[in-house]
Amino acid sequence: MFKIFKTLYFLTSFIFLFNYELSASPTNENNFHAVKEYLKNLNTLEASFIQISNDGDIKRGKIFFNLPGKLRIDYIEPDNLLITSNGFWLTVQNKKLKQTNNIPLERTPLNLFLNKKFNFEDNSNIKFKIENDVITLTFFEDQKASKFELEFNSNPLRLRKWVIIDEFENKTSVMLQNIEMDVKLSNKIFIPDFYDEKSD
């Protein structure tokens, strides 16, 4: 159970309340505006991912989302986790053990991202940085809490990675590969593969 929720934490601490620190540079302002528009217009995505934890553990899989609300994160063997969302519930399943845990999506930070509840006008908890053509948005609740980073290639602008940094500065990176955007996705892939009566 701990392993399931550790993985869930890494992949669903996706968006915190926003605050950005931005210089007066027109280039920075233009890039920040471009990132806001990118996230605003992000609807469907399909990609492979490689997840690397602080201890070097590597997991692989596929991720799909159809905003607002729908998500599928499917780990490949030897990991047997499947995470889906229908916009109301986040379902975490161990396919090998046939275990299912349902969590209200609104109780997870992922709700802000999946339901596109962005509030870039609240300037309290986001940092914006450009370095070597990489744009990084860092989201945090306070300086001592966990942080979540989104990394983008700046030219062309494209989401390439997110990083979770816990309160002990342990990092888990999720790198996206073979990204396809604005693809047509069947609603069936966002339905859990099986059900049982166990839920949180």
Locate the predicted segments by residue.
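Bacterial N-terminal signal peptides that target proteins for export
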Residues: M1-Y9
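Gly/Pro-enriched, hydrophobic low-complexity segments
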Residues: E121-S199
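Solvent-exposed strand-loop boundary residues in beta-sheet-rich modules
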Residues: S53-D55, K96-K98, F168
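Short hydrophobic/aromatic-rich beta-strand segments that constitute the beta-sheet cores
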Residues: F49, L71-Y75, L90-Q93, L137, ...
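An acidic-aromatic
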Residues: I63-N111, T172
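Boundary at the C-terminal end of the N-terminal hydrophobic targeting segment
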Residues: L22-P26
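Bacterial N-terminal signal peptides
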Residues: Y9-L17
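A short, Trp-centered hydrophobic/proline-enriched beta-strand micro-motif
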Residues: E37-G56
